[in-house]
Amino acid sequence: MEIFLQQNFVAIWHHFLSFEISRSKFALETWGSGNAYLIFQVIAWHHILVMTDHAESKIRDEAIDLWFQLSKTGFKTRSVLTYSLISSLTSLSIETVRRHVKKLEENNWVFYSKKEGVKFSPSHENNMFLADDFNVKEVRDLGRFLDVLEKRKQKKFN
């Protein structure tokens, strides 16, 4: 796929950037800043990684159900998401991470303790927003970008 992207760069890359800009704009409006969004994205990524250990299905609707279930009940994992790890993954200072995690906790997105680290723990309303608005838009827009790739590949082979 990398070679395909290199050979079709001009025809494809602006679609990728459009996807990224649209997603980032919506995320910045939601979380208030680039740093907050980047930190939240790492927290959601960690939650998805832990969730995959419990997932039996690959279907989005069933994954959303499991997402909601684990957000309410929590999950057993040895994987602890620390300020240090978030800092390492985002290149933000630990103090910046700490401040933003505190804001996310105040806004009912996460829970933090020294023992358990940062855990995705949204309010019902926040979870509904993620599942019914934010992720729906992400999936739709990513699908549209992948359609562009698929059409370009078909054009090349026809």
Regions found by a protein language model. Give the residues of each.
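Short gly/ser-rich anion-binding loops that grip negatively charged ligand groups
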Residues: E29, K72-K76, T90
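Short amphipathic alpha-helical interaction segments
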Residues: S91-E106
